[in-house]
Amino acid sequence: MTNHKKEALLQNFNKKFADKMHMLKLNYDHLPLYQQAFSHSSFINDFNMDRLAHNERLEFLGDAVLELTVSRYLFDKYPELPEGNLTKMRATIVCEPSLVIFANKIQLNELILLGKGEEKTGGRTRPSLVSDAFEAFVGALYLDQGLDAVWQFSEEVIFPHVEDDELMGVVDFKTQFQELIHRLSKGNVTYRLIDEQGPAHHRLFTSEVLLEGEPVAKGQGRTKKESEQKAAEKAYNDMKKK
């Protein structure tokens, strides 16, 4: 392909990237760094660019930055959880399927620069390719704006969704609470749905957890399962404080 074609693709990227960063309320200084973050090896090969101009090195860096950022978040948010649970949570949050979920929430895949063949074969929606681009973007953001900017990005794109039903099972507070009650010989734990509100496509469920038939905590979520998890989390934390 010609350099003219490459420049046209990069100009299109520059505009879309500026719009995306504005939407995310993020600043940037070094545009070529982000061009590299979204450059798949197929794009580099099509235009005979430097063999290290693709995003794999930034992906490597972004992976480590994400692990650090998520580790700090979990450490602060769940002071009662032991190391094993925190490790399990972190692994689930930074795994490929989760990163694809986060990337898709902000349509990050539309920024990826692909070679002609990769584009034709559906590379833009390939999970491994999308998650790699997400990590590379985080790596570029870290180099360009520092860890504070990565934290700001994570507060908008990652942290609010850690307990979404899509990622549920990362921390199973129902099991945590059940095990705590068993250790304390406190009796039987049950759950009941006490309220549903909102239209079918955006329901809000409220559940409560009962100990020996007596309500001890309530929780809300977008699914019944999530509301039960929230109720169990509150009951678990309250019980640990006693």
Swiss-Prot record:
CDD domains recorded: DSRM_RNAse_III_family (cd10845), RIBOc (cd00593)
What is this protein's name?
Answer: Ribonuclease 3
Question: What are its GO cellular component terms?
Answer: cytoplasm
Chain residues that bind Mg(2+): 59, 132, 135
**Organism of origin:** Staphylococcus carnosus (strain TM300)
Known catalytic reactions:
Endonucleolytic cleavage to 5'-phosphomonoester
Q: Which GO terms describe its biological process?
A: mRNA processing; regulation of gene expression; rRNA processing; tRNA processing
Q: Which PROSITE patterns does the record associate with it?
A: DS_RBD, RNASE_3_1, RNASE_3_2
Q: Which residues form the active site?
A: 63, 135
Q: Which GO terms describe its molecular function?
A: double-stranded RNA binding; metal ion binding; ribonuclease III activity; rRNA binding
Q: Which UniProt keywords apply?
A: Cytoplasm, Endonuclease, Hydrolase, Magnesium, Metal-binding, mRNA processing, Nuclease, RNA-binding, rRNA processing, rRNA-binding, tRNA processing
Q: Which domain of life is it from?
A: Bacteria
Q: Where is this region: Disordered?
A: 216-242
The record's similarity note reads: Belongs to the ribonuclease III family.
Primary location class: cytoplasm
Q: Where in the cell is it found?
A: Cytoplasm
Q: Which gene encodes it?
A: rnc
- InterPro entries to which the protein is assigned, alphabetical: dsRBD_dom (IPR014720), RNase_III (IPR011907), RNase_III_dom (IPR000999), RNase_III_sf (IPR036389)
**In this protein, which residues make up the domain named DRBM?**
172-241
Required co-factors: Mg(2+)
- Residue ranges of domain RNase III in the record: 10-146
